[in-house]
Amino acid sequence: MIGRLRGNLLEKQPPELLIEVSGIGYEVQMPMSCFYELPEVGSEAIIYTHYVVREDAQLLYGFNTKNERALFREVIKANGVGPKLGLAILSGMTAAQFVQSVEREDISTLVKLPGVGKKTAERLVVEMKDRLKGWGAGDLFTPATDAAPMDDGSEFITSPQSAVDEAVSALIALGYKPQQASKTVSQIAKPDMTSEVLIRESLKSMI
């Protein structure tokens, strides 16, 4: 079981990163709400991981804190919600927003997430509302992600078309349909926007 990685951050290709630990490179998928808080490429990073073994693959999902990982594990306990959908849910909104939506039984907001239909949204509310009651909201998310302005994403691709392409690819990887991803990014894109900003603003607009 791989629960924590500490090493050199080699690549950032949202929503995936590559981190080198003792000469071994680990590919890790991370919710965008956590991805925004990663240090620059070349810096040391500490990532808490959830390890998934399937017949055809071994996958790592990464988080900045143990509590973010704990919330992810609660989300994927819900009937019909696997790691891929859990990743999309916690990319489409911050952990605090998700908890608030569940507590308020806000089905209309939850169904805007990729892969979440009305039945899945209702299951999330029914199955998670009681489980989340004992959690303090401040323990469920990285404060900087939910409350503070993001950095400028200077280590991300800055060429206008490359930034657009990377943003579209990231949204598709999170479960959005190609046409929806392309249309949303195109509507938001400006010449000076980095791919990180494009991804973040696109996700906001779809929620």
UniProtKB/Swiss-Prot annotation:
Q: Where is this region: Domain I?
A: 1-64
- One GO CC term on file: Holliday junction resolvase complex
Keywords (alphabetical) are: Cytoplasm, DNA damage, DNA recombination, DNA repair, DNA-binding
Which Pfam family is one of those matched by this entry?
RuvA_C
* Subcellular localization: Cytoplasm
- Using the UniProt annotation, give all residue ranges assigned to the region (Domain II): 65-143
Relay the domain remarks.
Has three domains with a flexible linker between the domains II and III and assumes an 'L' shape. Domain III is highly mobile and contacts RuvB.
- Assembly and oligomerization: Homotetramer. Forms an RuvA(8)-RuvB(12)-Holliday junction (HJ) complex. HJ DNA is sandwiched between 2 RuvA tetramers; dsDNA enters through RuvA and exits via RuvB. An RuvB hexamer assembles on each DNA strand where it exits the tetramer. Each RuvB hexamer is contacted by two RuvA subunits (via domain III) on 2 adjacent RuvB subunits; this complex drives branch migration. In the full resolvosome a probable DNA-RuvA(4)-RuvB(12)-RuvC(2) complex forms which resolves the HJ.
Q: Which family does it belong to?
A: Belongs to the RuvA family.
How is this protein named in the record? Holliday junction branch migration complex subunit RuvA
Q: Which organism is it from?
A: Aliivibrio fischeri (strain ATCC 700601 / ES114) (Vibrio fischeri)
